């Protein structure tokens, strides 16, 4: 699928399998989400620009590379996205964090905003939106639209599992925003959940129902 990168790495596949298993405990699920998010972050940042600097090692001078370009913001969609943001911060601890509160109306399945807090200079940063599940796609579409209204132009979306419908919906609304995911599942059920998916990522992360 154009604009979609499926991170097909043995560690990612292994961790995702354990997350899909309904017998996996809340503690283990939370840890696996964090670990998998770190691996996905490694891939989504693969093409970051760098520049050459001169440094002194303990044994002599050398030229080496540092990251250049825009500073990063991780923007988890509350609440499930928080578990992924932690794993990404493990890899890029200097990144800022925005919070986007959206819930899915159980009848219309449309996204409803209830909270939005970002760094003041977010328009000047690379923003990576994170949400474990890209199901109907409505929540991701709404979150990205909200960020664009704040002036953000450099956006990426990262999830654990996407549905075909979710990918199509997000790409249709925001064709300029690339997607990274660990898997793409074929179906949604009548409640808008991905099948086979991994259940409600927020409930499984925080031990709620």
From Swiss-Prot:
Regulation of its function: Allosterically activated by GTP.
Enzyme Commission numbers on file: 2.4.2.9
Biological process according to GO: UMP salvage; uracil salvage
Cofactor: Mg(2+)
CDD domains per UniProt: PRTases_typeI (cd06223)
GO molecular function annotation: GTP binding; magnesium ion binding; uracil phosphoribosyltransferase activity
Tagged with keyword Glycosyltransferase: yes
Residues holding uracil: 194, 199-201
Entry keyword set: Allosteric enzyme, Glycosyltransferase, GTP-binding, Magnesium, Nucleotide-binding, Transferase
Recorded catalytic activity of this chain's protein: UMP + diphosphate = 5-phospho-alpha-D-ribose 1-diphosphate + uracil
Binding site for 5-phospho-alpha-D-ribose 1-diphosphate: 79, 104, 131-139, 200
SUPFAM superfamilies (UniProt xref): PRTase-like
UniProt remark on cofactor binding: Binds 1 Mg(2+) ion per subunit. The magnesium is bound as Mg-PRPP.
Pathway: Pyrimidine metabolism; UMP biosynthesis via salvage pathway; UMP from uracil: step 1/1
Purpose of the protein: Catalyzes the conversion of uracil and 5-phospho-alpha-D-ribose 1-diphosphate (PRPP) to UMP and diphosphate.
Family listed: Belongs to the UPRTase family.
UniProt xrefs under PANTHER family: ADENINE PHOSPHORIBOSYLTRANSFERASE, URACIL PHOSPHORIBOSYLTRANSFERASE, CHLOROPLASTIC
Protein name, entry field: Uracil phosphoribosyltransferase
Organism annotation: Caulobacter sp. (strain K31)
């Amino acid at each position: 699928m154009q604009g979609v990168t499926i991170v097909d790495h043995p560690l990612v596949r292994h961790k995702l399998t354990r997350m899909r298993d309904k017998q996996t405990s809340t503690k283990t699920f939370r840890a696996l989400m964090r670990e998998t998010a770190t691996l996905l972050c490694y891939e989504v940042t693969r093409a970051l620009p760098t520049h050459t600097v001169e440094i002194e090692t303990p044994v002599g001078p050398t030229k080496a590379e540092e990251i250049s370009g825009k500073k990063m913001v991780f923007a988890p969609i509350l609440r499930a996205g928080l578990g992924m943001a932690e794993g990404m911060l493990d890899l890029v601890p200097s990144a800022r964090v925005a919070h986007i509160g959206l819930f899915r109306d159980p009848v219309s399945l449309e996204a409803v905003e209830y909270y939005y807090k970002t760094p003041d200079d977010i328009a000047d940063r690379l923003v990576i939106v994170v949400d474990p599940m890209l199901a109907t796609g409505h929540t991701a579409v709404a979150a990205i639209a909200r960020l664009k209204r704040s002036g953000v132009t450099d956006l990426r979306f990262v999830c654990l599992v996407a549905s075909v419908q979710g990918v199509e919906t997000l790409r249709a609304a925001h064709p300029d925003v690339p997607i990274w995911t660990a898997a793409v599942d074929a179906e949604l059920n009548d409640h808008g959940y991905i099948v086979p998916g991994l259940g409600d990522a927020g409930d499984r992360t925080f031990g709620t129902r």
